[in-house]
Structures are given as C-alpha cells and as structure tokens.
Amino acid sequence: MAYSKKVMDHYENPRNVGSFSSTDLNVGSGLVGAPACGDVMKLQIKVNEKGIIEDACFKTYGCGSAIASSSLVTEWVKGKSIEEAESIKNTTIVEELDLPPVKIHCSILAEDAIKAAISDYKRKKIN
C-alpha cells in the first residue's frame, strides 16, 4: 500500500506534536484509541476567551495514516470556533489525505479525538 504525498508529508514532518497542561482550564484534551489496530491518539486544543481555538497539539502512537490525520486536524482547527471544529468530519480528512479504505479508521480516530477534546473543554467551562 502506497501512501499519498500528503500523508507522507504529515508523517515525515508532523505539525504540532506535543502537549499542553491538562489542568489549564482553557485546554481540552481528547484521548481515543482503536483496539483493532492499536492506534492511540491524544489531541489537545487551547481555546481563547472568545471561544476560538488558538493552538492545538497531538501525540499519536500508530501508523503513518494516524499520525498524518492527527497532524492535519491540528492544523485545521487553529483559528476556528468550537462550533466550526466540531463540524470536521472524517470523510473530509479521508479526501484531503487520500486515505485508502483500510486506513479510514485513522480519520475516524482524528474526528473522535477533536470531538473528545471539545467535550473536555466544555466540561471544564461548566464546572
């Protein structure tokens, strides 16, 4: 199976690798995994007082498609509102990265991770 140039670019030069303090009230963290393949994805967002995602980072243990999906999503959410980030769908990730059918689960993980990070952020703001 050959990866697309975009997958290879994000895999070889991942953007936004790292982590924020999970105790920061402006940080939302999402941790998701796929037991079938062993991929684990942690994605975090940092939201400003206007509800705009000003930064994002990730740490992913998995294949090139999982790393590329994480990297791409952290780029996409920067500068977006929470609502805009929530609307990101795995199908858009698949199209952008030209993922083969056997790697679609990686895009689902990325969508689930951003939604989990947003849920965590919202939970912190309510409490």
Swiss-Prot record:
A cellular component term (GO) from this record? Answer: cytoplasm
Cited InterPro entries: ISCU, NIF_FeS_clus_asmbl_NifU_N
The record, for Pfam families, names:
NifU_N
One Gene Ontology term from the biological process aspect of the record: iron-sulfur cluster assembly
* GO MF entry, a single one: iron-sulfur cluster binding
Write down the superkingdom of origin: Bacteria
Q: Which NCBIfam families match?
A: iscU (TIGR01999)
Free-text function comment from the UniProt entry:
A scaffold on which IscS assembles Fe-S clusters. Subsequently gives the nascent cluster to other proteins. It is likely that Fe-S cluster coordination is flexible as the role of this complex is to build and then hand off Fe-S clusters.
* Subunit structure comment from the entry: Forms a heterotetramer with IscS; each subunit of the IscS dimer contacts an IscU monomer.
What does the sequence similarity comment in the record state about its family?
Belongs to the NifU family.
What's the protein called, per UniProt?
Iron-sulfur cluster assembly scaffold protein IscU
Organism expressing this protein natively = Buchnera aphidicola subsp. Acyrthosiphon pisum (strain APS)
Q: Which gene encodes it?
A: iscU
